[in-house]
């Protein structure tokens, strides 16, 4: 069963994403911010297939979190979907430069999120096989 790590400081958003991912057949873990995410990933025996991450969070923002994940050889293959209220083209460019695989703005359609997550997992699997 594919595994997703939901990283957002808003409990209601984590709940919404968790619920829809579980209904779609995913195992779900949660982190409340970027620092919590990195702590979880470093301790995990089994890494998630995909991470959904917000941008604006306390302690460590989403862009810095993505950059840290991409810099770590053990984690750099994980697919990342940014889910945020920031939809300006400059925000999307910063996220893409940091290494996100997909970018969705809030409010988001839960079905589109599930579809996007499945898509980036497929692309991540192809990257992993070719490396």
Residue ranges of model-derived segments:
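Receiver (REC) domain active-site loop signature in two-component systems and cognate sites
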Residues: 57
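Acidic, metal-coordinating helix/loop segments flanking the phosphotransfer/catalytic sites
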Residues: 30-50
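Short, glycine/charged-rich "phosphate-handling" switch motifs in NTP-dependent
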Residues: 101
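Charged docking surfaces used in two-component/phosphorelay signaling
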Residues: 15-23
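Short, conserved "switch-loop" micro-motifs in signal-transduction and mechanochemical regulators
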Residues: 86-87
């Amino acid at each position: 069963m594919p595994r997703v790590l939901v990283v957002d400081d808003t409990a209601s958003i984590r709940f919404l994403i968790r619920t829809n991912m579980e209904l779609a057949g995913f195992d779900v873990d949660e982190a409340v911010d970027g620092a919590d995410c990195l702590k979880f990933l470093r301790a995990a025996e089994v890494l998630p297939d995909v991470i959904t991450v917000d941008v604006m969070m306390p302690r460590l923002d989403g862009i810095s979190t993505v950059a840290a994940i991409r810099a770590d050889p053990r984690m750099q293959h994980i697919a990342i979907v940014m889910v945020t209220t920031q939809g300006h083209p400059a925000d999307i460019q910063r996220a893409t430069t940091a290494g996100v695989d997909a970018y969705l703005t809030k409010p988001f359609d839960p079905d589109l999120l599930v579809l996007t997550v499945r898509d980036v997992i497929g692309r991540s699997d192809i990257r992993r096989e070719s490396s």
